[in-house]
Amino acid sequence: MTAWQPRALLALCAIGLCSGASANLTFSGTLNEPPPCTIDAGNTIEIDFGDVGVKRVDGVRYRRGVGYVINCGADTLPWALKLSVNGTPTAFDGSAVQTSVPALGIRVFQNSLPFALNTPMDITLSSPPTLEVVPVQQPGATLPPARFTAVATLLAEYQ
């Protein structure tokens, strides 16, 4: 391109011989907050394993169901609901909550499969997963006679 060509093009555009189109853009929307949810009306869910034999902890015996009810507001669409069990996992099982006894954990199951702690999963409010828990011990460990406790949080949230 010679030196005069860019100047000529600029002059043509300046006097209106070059044309273009423009349009205005308008953006709008509504910010919505997801409906509030509660699990068991905010009450603590307690699972008592009773007396557990130190030599009988095998990940099968003492299995218990976790009864819970999720209640959310009436307008749940189009929100995607997620459920998680949050707590400190044992060093030997990512699906087991650490108890007050170092070599003992409480494994969590969802629909009979191990439920990885601190990992949200998609659920449907009309058919939430069945949750179960069972005591498990670290392989090769010997459990001492002792009372044990463990704490986790069952969390339902919209994404």
Task: Describe each region flagged by the PLM.
Residues 2-4, 21-159:
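Mature extracellular/passenger domains of Gram-negative fimbrial/pilin and adhesin proteins
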Residues 9-17:
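Bacterial N-terminal signal peptides
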